[in-house]
């Protein structure tokens, strides 16, 4: 459907287009819902762009004509005579407007509009208009496009029956599209900012300035009471004044090192539409989640076979691998329950959980999308922390209990044997080898804790716990919409989180290029392109998090660094990036 494509394009291009417009006035824009900002918005079709130009030119002409009309009325008879003669000329040389409303346009004006359509890419008025697109304008422009196409079809002669049949089908499709656009036009309307100004006051949010943003606006001022008290009261007043439900965001913007508080107002119908477009809680979404879960269990099964002793039978495979599966399921299950309970406490809807398969570690964690607005920065912080902390605790509990039960000597009767190839060129896994011990010393001699020609024995549950710690740390990297990226956005803001995300992507890329790590390459590509971008802004980004959450963030950052940083006792036999002495050959 043509209308849905343009409306969707404007929804996801509003943030990037508004950045261009507001940067000229030295104001920082707010990219509301561009979840993956590394993806460019889809461009408008040329026919829609032409209509945008016409609408822009008509609006500019009306604005210029308004003061001229007032001066004509004040001028007296001479101005009236000039106006009359002007209309007389229009009556002789004019043609009916495309809308058929009786408004006349001269040939010069039509030629000018046609030239603007040809040169729309370089037209400054068009660029200013596109600086703040809205759904209401898109619907009107698509409706005009449908009307023009219908008139063109009516004027074309029926050269043959086949052409007439095709035109009839096209005419019917355009007529149905026009009806849908008329229904949508009654739903999506731009808010009247002049009416909304009176809703702000000393007892809620004192607004001193306002500017248009999409179909809503950004009110600049200062908050007079806590957000949890102001938001419901202000939403009710604005909804009554606007005649439609609205959604509010309380945020901060920096301009020349001056931080200002702003209240952003948007029609609720448009926000609900965008959340509906991007949600994954659909039959296809659940089917994809099941497919990824099956794939992940398959990669765990394949990866487990690499750690069996030589000559192992199928019974050995079952007895040795089942504990590893149980360990993975325990970590994933506990972290998923903790995440959904925390999200429910804040009233945040989550998408289905998507497992990330890996043929190296079996699983690289779980990813969720937010399918509703976040009420505040506390929710943005607590939800990912709940997943990370619960995964860490479960992994440590499994590893410690398994090491204690087998005496940390031979891995128990169902031991897995971790071969040295597992760690080769993988600095992110050095923590695992530092715990279970290396296979050989610096001279290549097999150490007592290893079995020559096989590997280092380890209990399956302990191995699952160690891998769970590493995978959780990978998800805590401050990149994109990983759990660590969400925490960084809550702690430091969107700008600092974007810088950290870029630095993390560069570091992972360096590990892949310099260190030759396949895991660095795979995780860097996944974090940058699949989970890249920024998370949805919280509705309350003014209320501070508090020192306790900053302390928790510091603790998680230290744990993440210690478990991922290359160490001499792990992957490498010497400090930092020394080459391993054992290269395989089992």
UniProtKB/Swiss-Prot annotation:
Transit peptide as recorded in UniProt: 1-54
Keyword Hydrolase set for record: yes
Gene Ontology MF annotations: metallopeptidase activity
Chain segments carrying region Disordered: 13-32, 58-122
Broad EC category: hydrolase
Function statement: Probable membrane-associated metalloprotease that may be involved in chloroplast development.
Family: Belongs to the peptidase M50B family.
Official protein name in the record: Probable zinc metalloprotease EGY3, chloroplastic
Source organism of this protein record: Oryza sativa subsp. japonica (Rice)
Native organism taxonomy: Eukaryota, Viridiplantae, Streptophyta, Embryophyta, Tracheophyta
């Amino acid at each position: 459907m043509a209308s849905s494509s343009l409306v969707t394009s404007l929804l996801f291009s509003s943030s990037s287009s508004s950045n261009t417009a507001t940067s000229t006035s030295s104001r920082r824009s707010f990219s509301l819902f561009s979840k993956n900002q590394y993806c460019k918005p889809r461009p408008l079709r040329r026919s829609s762009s032409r209509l945008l130009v016409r609408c822009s030119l008509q609006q500019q002409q009306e604005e210029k004509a308004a003061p001229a009309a007032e001066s004509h009325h004040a001028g007296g008879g001479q101005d009236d005579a000039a106006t009359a003669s002007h209309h007389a000329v229009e009556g002789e040389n004019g043609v009916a407007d495309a809308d058929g409303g009786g408004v006349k346009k001269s040939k010069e004006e039509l030629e000018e509009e046609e030239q603007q359509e040809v040169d729309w890419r370089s037209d400054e008025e068009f660029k200013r208009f596109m600086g703040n697109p809205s759904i209401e304008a898109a619907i009107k422009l698509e409706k005009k496009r449908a009307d023009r196409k219908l008139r063109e079809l009516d004027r074309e002669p029926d050269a043959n029956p086949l052409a007439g049949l095709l035109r009839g089908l096209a005419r019917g499709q355009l007529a149905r599209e026009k009806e849908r656009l008329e229904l949508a036009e009654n739903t999506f309307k731009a808010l009247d900012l002049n009416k909304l100004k009176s809703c702000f006051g000393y007892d809620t949010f004192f607004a001193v300035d306002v500017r248009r943003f999409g179909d809503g606006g950004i009110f600049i001022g200062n908050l007079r009471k806590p957000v949890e008290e102001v938001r419901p009261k202000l939403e009710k007043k604005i909804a009554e004044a606007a005649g439609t439900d609205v959604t509010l965001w309380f945020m901060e913007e920096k301009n020349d090192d001056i931080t200002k508080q702003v209240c952003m107002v948007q029609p609720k119908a448009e926000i609900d539409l965008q959340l509906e477009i991007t949600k994954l809680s659909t039959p296809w979404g659940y089917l994809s989640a099941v497919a990824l879960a099956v794939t992940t269990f398959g990669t765990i099964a394949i990866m487990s076979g690499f750690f069996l002793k030589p000559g192992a039978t199928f019974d050995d495979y079952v007895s040795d691998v089942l504990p590893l599966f149980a360990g993975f399921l325990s970590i994933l299950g506990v972290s998923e329950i903790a995440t959904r309970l925390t999200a429910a406490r804040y009233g945040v809807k989550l998408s289905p959980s998507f497992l990330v398969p890996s043929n190296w570690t079996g699983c690289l964690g779980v990813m969720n999308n937010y399918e509703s607005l976040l009420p505040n920065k506390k929710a943005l912080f607590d939800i990912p922390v709940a997943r990370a902390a619960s995964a860490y605790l479960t992994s440590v509990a499994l590893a410690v209990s398994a090491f204690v039960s087998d005496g940390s000597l031979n891995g128990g009767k169902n031991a897995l044997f971790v071969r040295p190839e597992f760690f080769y060129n993988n600095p992110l896994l050095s923590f695992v080898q530092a715990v279970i011990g290396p296979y050989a010393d610096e001279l290549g001699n097999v150490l007592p804790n290893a079995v020559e020609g096989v590997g280092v024995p380890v209990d399956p549950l302990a191995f699952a716990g160690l891998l769970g710690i590493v995978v959780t740390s990978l998800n805590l990297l401050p990149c994109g919409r990983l759990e660590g990226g969400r925490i960084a956005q809550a702690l430091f803001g969107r700008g600092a989180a974007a810088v950290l995300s870029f630095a993390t992507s560069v570091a992972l890329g360096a590990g892949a290029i310099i260190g030759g790590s396949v895991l660095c390459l795979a995780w860097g590509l996944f974090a940058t392109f699949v989970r890249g971008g920024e998370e949805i802004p919280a509705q309350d980004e003014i209320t501070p998090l508090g020192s306790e959450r900053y302390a928790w963030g510091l603790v998680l950052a230290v744990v993440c660094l210690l478990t991922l940083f290359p160490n001499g006792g792990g992957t490498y036999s010497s400090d930092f990036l020394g080459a391993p002495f054992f290269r395989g050959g089992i």
